[in-house]
Structure formats: C-alpha cells, structure tokens
Amino acid sequence: MHKYILLLLTVILLNACSAADMQSPALQPTLPPPTSMPTRSEAAFTTAIPDKTAIPLPAGTPFRLPYSELAATAELADLATSAQPDTEIEVDKVAALSAALQRPPRDQVELARALGGVTDASAVARTTPLDVQVGDVEQFWVTSTATNRTYTVTAELRYAGPVALMYVEQGLIIDQATLEQAARVFEEQIYPRTRELFGSELQPGVDGDLRITILNGRSPGGGVAGYFSSRDSVPSSVNRFSNEREMFFMNIESVNPANPSYLQVLAHEFQHMIHWNEQRNAAIWFNEGCSTLSEDLNGFVTHSFVMAYLANPNTQLTAWSEVPERAIAHYGAANLFMRYIYTHYTGEEGLVDLIRANAGNNPDAFVELAARTRPDITSFGTLFADWALANVLNDPHLADGRYSYPTGPDEPEWLPTTVKPRLLNIGTTDNTVYQFGVNYYALPDGPLTVEFDGATSVSLVGTEPHGTYAWWSGRGDNSVSTLTHPVNLEGLDSAVLQFDTWYELEKHYDYAFVSVSVDDGTTWQTLAGMHTTNEDPHGANYGNGLNGVSGAPGVDTRSGIRGSWVTETMELSAYIGQPILLRFWQISDDAFNAPGLLIDNIRICSNTVADQCVLEDDVEAGYGDWQAEGFARIDGELPQTWELRLIHTGADGDLSVRNIPTDSAGQATIRLGTNERAILVVAATTPHTTEPASYQLRIQ
C-alpha cells in the first residue's frame, strides 16, 4: 500500500459503480441488524479491477476435511507446551528487543515545532464550528494513489446534517435524494454503531466542529474506494496539504451512494478515523482488521478479502504489503483473525479495549484477553495456532470449540470455506513460511515417519551489521524513533560526520533524518548528505531525508530490490566551537512500513587534522552515551520459533489436535501408524521481522 492513508482497495471492492450507475434512480439503502446476515448476496456484486489483475479466488465446492465426519471423540493434547526456544537466553533476547522497540506515536504538531521550524504550531486550526451552508463551494486537497500526486479539487456542500457534511466535487452528477439518504443512513445507523463498537473520533477536532466532512470526488487512476488521512486532522501550518477537517474521501468512480458498497466503505473508513484518535500508532494489520470487522458488524459481511487469504494462507498476519495485489490477502488475514477474536473473546464490548491496549503492536493484549477464557493460551503463537486450526477445521464440536467460528441463527457464517492443505508424498520437501503465516500439509497415510528440520534463527531485516552490532530504528506505523548523542565541537576547526547506513523506507512517505540541535533539543536542523533528498510531495520530509532503498537511487520498496550498505558523509563545520546534540530520526506515517534504518561505524572528525576525532563508535562496545528511544542495538538475527500442530485421525476414526514441540535445533519427529491420517500445520512465529523462515520435511 503505497501511501500514508488508510484505504480500501478497489481491486476487490464489490459493486463498484459505473458512469451509468451514477445517474440511476436513487436506491433507498437501509442496513440490516448489525450482526445478522447482509440483505444482499455475494453473487449480486461484481469485482472492479481497474488496471490490475486480481488474485484468483478458489472455485468449486468448498473444501472440507475428508474425515471430519468420522470424529466420534476428540482430545486437546499438549497445548500447554509451545514450540519455543529451549534456552532462556534466546527468549530474553526477543523480550529485550521488544522492550527497546517501543516507538512513540508520531505527533505531527511536535515534529513541526522541532523539525519543521513552526515554533508556534497549534493542535487545532479553529475552536468554533465551521460556518457553512448548503451550496457553499470549497477547495480540498486530494491525493491520487495511482499518480502519487496531491492536488486541489473544488467541491460543493450538498448536505449539512447533525453528523455529516457531504461535499461533491464539481462536475460529478449525483442524485440529491440518493446522497441525502446515504448521509442519513450514515448518521443514524453507521455512525452510532461504529462508535459503540470501537470508540470515538476526535471531537471537536482540528476544525472545532463535531461534524465529519465526507468529500465525494474522483481519484484519477483508480485503486482506491475511500481513504482517511490523519494529515487532515492537523492545521495546514503543520502539513501544508491538510484540509483542516475530520474527514474522509470517497471515490465516486468506484463506489456510488446508490449502492450498499458506498455505505460499506463509510463503515470501513470511519473505524480508521476512530482508531487514529483512540490509538495513534496502531499497527496497520490490526487497524485494517478492525475496519473490515466494522463492515461486518454494520451488516456488510462479504468474503472477497477472506477468500483471497484462504487461497494463500502463507501470508503474514502481522505485516502488510504496499503492492495492491498482494495487500488483498493481508486484508483477508486481518479480517478473518478479527472475526475469530470477536466471536471467541471480545464480543461487542471488548474491541475498544484491544485498540487502547495497542494490541497490534502489543500482541500480549490478545493473549491476556484469551487466557481469561482459556488459561492454556500463554503466547501469541499459541493463539495464532488456534486460529490457523480453525481455518482448516471449523468444527465447533472438536475439543472446546476453539477450532471454529461460532455462529448463531441471527449471525453470518464467518468462514465461507476452509483451507485446502497441500498433498505431500514420500520424500523431501524444502519450503519457507512467513512469520505468522501458515503452511498446511495433508500427509500420506501411515505408517510413516515425518522429520521436521526448521531454521533456528532468522534475519531481522534481511541484512547484517558490518561488525557484530548496529543500531536499528525498529519499524512501525505512524511512529518515531530517535537516537541522540552529545558532541562537543569545541577546539575543532572543521568537522565531518561519517557513518555507514542501510535502509528500506517507504518512498515519499517514511524518512530518516540526521539532525543537530544547539538549543538543548528544542529545535533541530536536518543535515544534507550524499544520499539525502529534499523532495517533499506529501509534507512528510522535514528538510533533508533518507528515503527509498539504500544503494538504489530512485527505487522504491515495492520493487523488491533490497537495500545495500552505503557510507554517508555530512558537513558539521557550521557548528564548530560549541557543544551540540546529534540525533538520528526515523519517522513513519500511517498505513505501511518497511524494514527501517540501520546505522554503524559513526565518526565525527576534523576534515583538516588527521585523527582528530570527537566521536568514534562502531557500536560494538554498548550503548555508551547514546540515548535510544525506539532504536535498538542489534546483531541482525532473532531466534526462530515454531508452532507445529498435527490434526490426527486414528485408525479408529478419533480426531485430535496435537502440539508438536521443536527442540533447540528446530527439529521434531512425527510418527503415524497403520491406517492413521494427519494434516500438519506449520507456522513460524518470530516477532519484529518480515523475513521468511526456512525448513525441511522428510517423509519416509
């Protein structure tokens, strides 16, 4: 997803409107009861794919386990034992990293004061409500995700209600009665329902007005049905592209107020607006999971996202892709996981608590919640494995019902089909699985032996430090990490900063900066270097930023090209003769984050006197005088953890789920007797990384 906004992709949005739709007679849309089945069928809608090739969805009869009906009894075996590293040292390494990588939320106002030179930046643009009337014409900033361009449109206020202000871009033809009816459904049904479930939007907000602005316009190039952008919720002095309103944009070329899909997108985007207020640095996967669940609980239960995931379960739940075609499966994973959490653990009352606990970045919040019902759930890996099993079994009668999506007479079918495992034969299979992704294997009938040999470590970002250690910025959405060191430049006649760096940062949206402060950290000036840019298409570059992929100028992270280590040099002679603070920053906006920034071999020396240096740090000796907030000193690897489950059918037809622990070498052995059958579920569960885990299966 190549933008700072949270959006719903048109590539899989159902019922996208055509030009003819826009002038069709007004439909009187009404919502069904919040948790009941939608009043429309999936077959009634078409899939809009503007300039894209959609991921093919599974066709034919939904797959069910061939032996599920044979289960006369079931047992829950060994689930208290997780497949975690055997040594406390390895566990402590992950825990220490998790503690270090607590990146604070991105405060755009504070950043404008510190880095943007806006010393009088305010959090609000006005304190009294907007003085607007139907018929008023305003200009708005709009971003095209296809062209990566921000531009202005002129729009007319067509509806002003107690909750919503509906603007329509000039030149678009939308039936007035249809627009007003959609606005009233939002005000009377979607607005209160979504607030009840997820919390409140910022009120009165940047514009001093309790009402939400909804701009209906065109998005050149397509690719988006609607978006919420947090930059609109700050004054234009903070971001020059801000519309200074709590608002979202609706792409009328994709969704029409006459169709239910328009209301579906409103439910989706309104949750994003609420989520931003309740938890500023929420992880995108959890945020999008809540928005797709908001669609469900507002009565719009569709399965396109979910079907894409079930066709490709080796998709990392806890990550995202900025490539639209790949993001489809991530939407499905997030939606399905939140359906599972909702039906088993939160109900309607517990969702906002997860948001406020920042569960997407703090998965222990999920564990603490689930353990109240099932005390054997002691890790996010265990909970994830339960969900993975539900996606292949969906059997409420097995064990205590955790391997299913509970439903009732007034509730929808949350899981439209189940995962189809890959059939394995006798022999050796080498494969990889993404962290918090899943591979499913249908094993040959017994008797047989399966030997699993999994990696014991995984790269944190896809490269290694120059020596043993380097500084890593961490990664996260809408968040900031800093690394600060005092430096005394007195006695030098010149000074140059030099360091080695590696970075992969979302192009045009996420930046790293090197800066100097001479007023004890109140304000900062960014430094220009050989690899920095002053381009700023979206108001996110505070002067001279590192951006894109190191060693590959002009390349963005969507290309698949990986970064390489480069040496950066920055002039400090303007600051000689005084003490300064040196600070590295990494600042990410909403919606997507790449692996981040590595720093190594930091030196500040005279460029005229040999060996006259005031700072030399190869990061090997420890933290020293560095103050890290969100940065961590890393060796480039983490222990690889595994969750293996065996869905076992005995010769007598009894079905059970068994945990298969791995040893300290990442190995496990499984034996099936005569006439025994099984499905092996393989999940990698190392946090903080998006690098896949490798393993080998040997069947004999």
Features from the language model and the residues they span:
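Terminal, low-complexity interaction segments
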Residues: G560-A594
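Extracellular beta-strand-rich recognition modules
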Residues: A495-Y503, I580-I587, L680
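Acidic/His/Gly-enriched intrinsically disordered linker/tail segments
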Residues: R231-N243, P260, Q264, Q279-Y345, ...
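Beta/coil-rich, acidic/histidine-enriched accessory regions frequently appended to metallopeptidases
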Residues: D21-M22, Q28, P32-L57, T61, ...
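Intrinsically disordered, low-complexity Ser/Thr/Pro-rich tracts
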Residues: M1-A100, Q108-R113, G117-D120, R126-T128, ...
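Extracellular beta-rich ligand/substrate-recognition surface
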Residues: L172, A470-S481, L505, V555-S564
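Extracellular carbohydrate recognition and processing domains
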Residues: Q525-A574, I660-S664
